[in-house]
């Protein structure tokens, strides 16, 4: 492409401006498991629905997770229609069917498996990170009103399988080595069972990854205003580590395969402004979030574009960005 090159005219047609490039999924995602690793999120949500018992007894013993749907995981920029489903208002005697009215985002980390394991062969906690290829940013969209009606007794179904969005970049665990951090557990909490415990995990099991959510409404776009930040948190505040997720997932002999993906669960910090969902920021819809342009939100509206990003940064190490993950909500048909 040097000026005057004989091949310049031919090669110039191969160049595409970055703004015009369309990303594809970084791999074919196999099985998908979503965890629930933020104790701050679990406690905050629990207080809204079970004020006398916000954190269930198993939370501090087990890395809670459930199997999700990989077919609806899309790349950043994949807009989606507002989902429909059954909901039941608190005062209603019967459920009704229609578009979700309490659509929410969830700020998560996506974890990609590199090398799998054979069926019946658990992965030990000290070997767990050898099976992790890398990490991305993940938005696990949630239909809260559909979820509230359907989730008993087996957990979420239609409230989660309509759309999930990942960033186009997978940052390898090798690149993240300078940002590994100490993992601790409160002395008053139950200490991990032996298969979830190791000196290595205590020393460097966490990842220091800053996470941020921004919102761009249709009105903001019309006025050519930039998106507004909603919250910022950090993955190092997670109650369970990546290695513990892998070790727990396979301790019964479950086999993982290359391209499998874990979701970390919503990553909220200890402070209210570090909430990783609208459910928390709006106190389950009872306290509208005020935006700089005068708009308010309790949950997401049609035309809203949710943007998430993540980065690692500290003195003495190269800054690492995870790119953006964003998608716009289209009206239900």
Go through each PLM region and give its residues.
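Active-site microenvironments in enzyme catalytic cores
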Residues: 1-232, 239-243, 248
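Active-site pocket scaffolds in enzymes
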Residues: 239-248, 257-258, 262-311, 316-325
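Interdomain boundary/hinge segments at the C-termini of tandem beta-sandwich modules
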Residues: 329-331
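Conserved phosphate/anionic-ligand binding catalytic regions in large, soluble enzymes, centered on
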Residues: 31-38, 255-265
